[in-house]
C-alpha cells in the first residue's frame, strides 16, 4: 500500500512512479486525503517530479542566516543555537524534520540532555520556546524567499506555557550597599557604569561600551541597541561631570566580572539570569513608584512594544486605584 499511517503521527505516501527500479518518492502529510491526492497526482504526472531535496536542516539554517539572519542583532546567536539542535536531532535532512522530531529533542533538552555547556545542564521552557520560534522563522523566511517549497513543519506546534518571569529590584538601602561595594572594588570604572545603569535604565552592555561620541552636555545617546533604534536620555550635571573627559573612543573597560564580585559581597540574592539586568529593573520600578509616565518610561528603556513596559505599571502609586472607587459595593455603601 503506497499510503499508510505514520506511527509518529500523520500519513506517509511512498511510491515508485517509474517502476520498481526507479527512484522512490516518500513524503509525509498531515491527513490521509493529502497523501492520496499526492499519490494520484504523482502517478499521473511522473515527469513533473521535482528534483529530490537533499539539503540538511543545517544548510537551510545557513541559507536563512546568509539571506536574513545576518541582519538581526541576535542572528549569530540563533544560528549557533539551531546548529546545536541540528546535531542533537541526528543531523536530519530538512525534508525529514518535523514536529515530532523537535518535540523529542526539546523533551530531552528539558531533562538535562543535549547541554550546550557544562555550566548549564537543564534549560527552561522559555529557552526552548525561543528555539521553536527560531526554527519557525527560518522556514517562514525561506518560504517567502522561494528557497523552501514545503509547509512550515512546526507551524502547528505550540510553545510551552510559562510563568511570568520574576523581576527583582533593589531598595534604596540595597542600592547604597551595592554602590559602596563597587566603590571599594579595585576596578576603576565599575561604580560609574553601575551609576549610569541606575540613572538611565541602560542595559549593561550599552553602558559598559559607551563611547565619547555618545556624550553631549547632560545627555547620553545609546546606539546599536537591542531594538535597533538610538535613544537619548538626559542625565544629571553630577553624573555628567563624573564621566571621563580625557578619553577618546570607548570610555570604560569590561567590568562584568567585577560587578558579579561586588554584588556577591553585598549578600543580595537575585533570580537566575538577572545579574546586571536588576539595575535596569531597579530604574524602571523606582521611575514608576515616583509617579513617572509609562509612555515616557517606554521611550527611556527603548522598548518597541508597550507590553514590555507595562510589566512595571503596577509600581505606580495610583495603579488600579479606580478599583476602590468604581467597584459595585461603593454604590451600595453610599446609599445607606
UniProtKB/Swiss-Prot annotation:
Tyr recombinase domain span:
165-325
The active site lies at 203, 226, 277, 280, 303, 312
Key words, A-Z: DNA integration, DNA recombination, DNA-binding, Hydrolase, Transferase, Viral genome integration, Virus entry into host cell
Listed GO MF terms? DNA binding; hydrolase activity; transferase activity
Q: Name one GO biological process term.
A: viral genome integration into host DNA
- Domain Core-binding (CB) intervals: 55-143
InterPro entries attached to this UniProt entry: CB, DNA_brk_join_enz, Integrase-like_cat_sf, Integrase_catalytic, Tyrosine_recombinase_XerCD
The family this protein is said to belong to: Belongs to the 'phage' integrase family.
What does it do?
Integrase is necessary for integration of the phage into the host genome by site-specific recombination. In conjunction with excisionase, integrase is also necessary for excision of the prophage from the host genome.
Q: What is this protein called?
A: Integrase
Q: Which organism is it from?
A: Escherichia phage 186
Tell me the name of the encoding gene. Answer: int
Amino acid at each position: 500500500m503506497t499510503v499508510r499511517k505514520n506511527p509518529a503521527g500523520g500519513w506517509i505516501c511512498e511510491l515508485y512512479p517509474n517502476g520498481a527500479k526507479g527512484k522512490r518518492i516518500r513524503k509525509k502529510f498531515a491527513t490521509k486525503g493529502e497523501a492520496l491526492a499526492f499519490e494520484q497526482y504523482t502517478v499521473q504526472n511522473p515527469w513533473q517530479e521535482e528534483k529530490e531535496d537533499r539539503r540538511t536542516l543545517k544548510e537551510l539554517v545557513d541559507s536563512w542566516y546568509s539571506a536574513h539572519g545576518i541582519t538581526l542583532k541576535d542572528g549569530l546567536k540563533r544560528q549557533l543555537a539551531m546548529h546545536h539542535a541540528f546535531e542533537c536531532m541526528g543531523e536530519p535532512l530538512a525534508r525529514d524534520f518535523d514536529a515530532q522530531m523537535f518535540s523529542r529533542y526539546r523533551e530531552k533538552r528539558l531533562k538535562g540532555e543535549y547541554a550546550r555547556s557544562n555550566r548549564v545542564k537543564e534549560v527552561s521552557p522559555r529557552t526552548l520556546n525561543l528555539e521553536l520560534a527560531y526554527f519557525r522563522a527560518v522556514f517562514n523566511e525561506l518560504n517567502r524567499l522561494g528557497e523552501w517549497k514545503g509547509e512550515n513543519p512546526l507551524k502547528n506546534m505550540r510553545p510551552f506555557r510559562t510563568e511570568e518571569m520574576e523581576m527583582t529590584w533593589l531598595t534604596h538601602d540595597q542600592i547604597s550597599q551595592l554602590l559602596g561595594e563597587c566603590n571599594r572594588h579595585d576596578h576603576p570604572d565599575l561604580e560609574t557604569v553601575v551609576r549610569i545603569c541606575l540613572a538611565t535604565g541602560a542595559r549593561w552592555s550599552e553602558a559598559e561600551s559607551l563611547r565619547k561620541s555618545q556624550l553631549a552636555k547632560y545627555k547620553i545617546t545609546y546606539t546599536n541597541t537591542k531594538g535597533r533604534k538610538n535613544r537619548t536620555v538626559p542625565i544629571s550635571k553630577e553624573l555628567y561631570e563624573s564621566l571621563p573627559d580625557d578619553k577618546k573612543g570607548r570610555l570604560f573597560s569590561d567590568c562584568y566580572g567585577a560587578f558579579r564580585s561586588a554584588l556577591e559581597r553585598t549578600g543580595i540574592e537575585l533570580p537566575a539570569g538577572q545579574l546586571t539586568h536588576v539595575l535596569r529593573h531597579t530604574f524602571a520600578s523606582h521611575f514608576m513608584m515616583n509617579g513617572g509616565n509609562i509612555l515616557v518610561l517606554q521611550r527611556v528603556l527603548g522598548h518597541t512594544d508597550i507590553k514590555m513596559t507595562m510589566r512595571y505599571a503596577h509600581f505606580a502609586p495610583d495603579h488600579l486605584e479606580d478599583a476602590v472607587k468604581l467597584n459595585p459595593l461603593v454604590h451600595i455603601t453610599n446609599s445607606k
